[in-house]
Amino acid sequence: MANVAVVGAQWGDEGKGKVVDWLSERADVVVRFQGGHNAGHTLVINGVTYKLSLLPSGVVRGKLSIIGNGVVIDPWALLAEIERIRAQGVEITPEVLKIAENACLILPLHAHLDKAREEASGTAKIGTTGRGIGPAYEDRVGRRAIRVCDLADEAVLKAKIATLLRHHNALLRGLGAAEVDGAELLAKLLDVAPKILPFADVVWQHLDEVRHTRKRVLFEGAQGAMLDVDHGTYPYVTSSNTVSGNAGTGSGVGPGQVGYVLGICKAYTTRVGEGPFPTELFDEIGKSIGERGHEFGTVTGRPRRCGWFDAVMVRQAVKVGGITGIALTKLDVLDGFKELKICTGYKLDGKVINHFPASMTGQANVEPIYEVIEGWSQSTRGVRSWKDLPATAIKYIRRIEELIEAPVALLSTSPEREDSILVHDPFAT
């Protein structure tokens, strides 16, 4: 039986929450495999809005939901999110939610360092959410992170805190920021430990059992391919691998278990924060797209930058992310425009190129080459059948498929989960 990995194919905020919820109804297990509470999913179910950051979308439907070892976890943020979702009537128990015991923690000192660095960077800032994601991943690869399993051993916590503070307090001193008190940090961790540890488990074993019983697993990615620490617009990226190759590594299964890779992208392009954005619109059209699409970050509330669909970027995401098919979202936002534009290539130093360059200079200087497509006046909002789409909307979709070299498997026409057109069932592969 096929598994499915859902990943972003742009700069995040593509509408993964709705698609994951739509698929999770038919999945047996939902797994988060990377990122932290810097990314958010908004789910709308029966008129009720749920905003999730760390919790896998499956919890809302009572499905076994796993936070994998590739996720960095702020335990206080996680507990606050659990209580908020419980207050909406959702039952969250250790039978429903399991956290990888080898997942690394985000501590208050990580957010402290994150903000101190951004302030010191001035105009060269990356535009992080300031929630400590990057510093937590640094500690993971630096082999000094505190992991979920460490919460059960006070002696280990004391030793690891001492190691952490030798590193972090030196950095903080250099930035002119206040140092961290070890005793205070230990007290906070000992207080939160009994609230987190009941959810801790050997999740790779559970996933292996699921594999042998041929149950369906949905791997839920955060952010998007162009925020990948290797393949994105470095250094304006997140601190983890967001592409599907990390679904296995970040959850404890082999790469062959990932299955169908569904890339999510909007019918236009958005980005939050700093970094290059070749098709960004600074005119009334860009403003209109932002207003129609309600383009504000789920977690940060920051307005998103808006622009035309960039087929070069999405095609690159398809290639490096192993994307099998695309879920195209927010088509309805483009209703009423007389003409639309699709970026089909870039000009750089007088030459035409068909990829997004790796260098910062190249990324900043590429000029989009546009193809103009006729728009449509008929509303597509809430359409649930391909035959009810305007002919020009279908033409727009088909052109996108040609340019990105991947088929549209799913089309979303509103935030409501049922307002979708299934072209190809990812679980049927």
Swiss-Prot record:
Its EC number is 6.3.4.4. Binds 1 Mg(2+) ion per subunit. IMP binds at residues 13-16, 38-41, 129, 143, 223, 238, 302. Substrate binds at residues 298-304. It comes from the Bacteria. The active site is at 13 (proton acceptor), 41 (proton donor). Pathway: Purine metabolism; AMP biosynthesis via de novo pathway; AMP from IMP: step 1/2. GO terms for cellular component: cytoplasm. It is an enzyme of class 6 (ligase). InterPro entries: Adenylosuccin_syn_GTP-bd, Adenylosuccinate_synth_dom1, Adenylosuccinate_synth_dom2, Adenylosuccinate_synth_dom3, Adenylosuccinate_synthetase, P-loop_NTPase. GO terms for biological process: 'de novo' AMP biosynthetic process; IMP metabolic process. Its cofactor is Mg(2+). Keywords: Cytoplasm, GTP-binding, Ligase, Magnesium, Metal-binding, Nucleotide-binding, Purine biosynthesis. Transmembrane segments: none annotated. It is found in: Cytoplasm. It catalyses: IMP + L-aspartate + GTP = N(6)-(1,2-dicarboxyethyl)-AMP + GDP + phosphate + 2 H(+). GTP binds at residues 12-18, 40-42, 304, 330-332, 412-414. Plays an important role in the de novo pathway of purine nucleotide biosynthesis. Catalyzes the first committed step in the biosynthesis of AMP from IMP. Belongs to the adenylosuccinate synthetase family. This is Adenylosuccinate synthetase. It comes from Paramagnetospirillum magneticum (strain ATCC 700264 / AMB-1).
